[in-house]
Design a protein with these regions (language model features):
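Active-site rim/adjacent substrate-binding subdomains
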Residues: 1-105, 117, 121-126, 132-140
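Catalytic glutamate of the conserved HExxH
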Residues: 109, 113-117
Length: 140
């Protein structure tokens, strides 16, 4: 007897996982992202693909759009809402290719994009993952 494959997680199911992840973030982090909107879509839109020079829409798992906290100013308010996009199909492909837990993949992508909200570069975040600490910060 063969198993009937279950359908891939829906946009709403990924949103629920992302919302659960947000609830588990430390208060110090969560406090600064209350106004950030989380959106789930199947793929980045074609303009994003072109602007980022993607070879494939599967090359991008998530994206932060907005003005990072290190560049915000009360003298120059931005009218746009800060948003984090999670792209369902690329995330699901990555999940299938790696065999990692889906919630772990979503958490990793979400925290990576939150890092951009804080003004961290990809290089900063790679360093943090490798070293386990934020450059320039020490614990007393």
């Amino acid at each position: 007897m063969t198993k009937t494959p279950s359908p891939p997680p829906s946009l709403n199911e990924l949103k629920a996982i992302a919302e659960t992840t947000l609830k588990t973030l430390p208060d110090e982090l969560a406090h600064h992202i209350t106004d950030v909107v989380i959106r789930i879509s199947d793929f980045p839109d074609p303009k994003i693909e072109r602007d980022m020079g993607l070879r494939s829409p599967f090359d991008l798992l998530g994206l932060y759009q907005g003005v990072s906290l290190d560049r915000k100013s009360v003298c120059d308010p931005t009218p746009d809402v800060d948003m984090i996009f999670l792209y369902r199909r690329p995330i699901l492909d990555y999940w299938c290719e790696t065999g990692e837990d889906l919630a772990h993949v979503i958490r990793h992508v979400l925290i990576h994009e939150i890092g951009h909200h804080f003004g961290l570069s990809d290089a900063d975040m790679e360093w943090i993952e490798k070293e386990g600490q934020v450059p320039g910060f020490t614990c007393a």
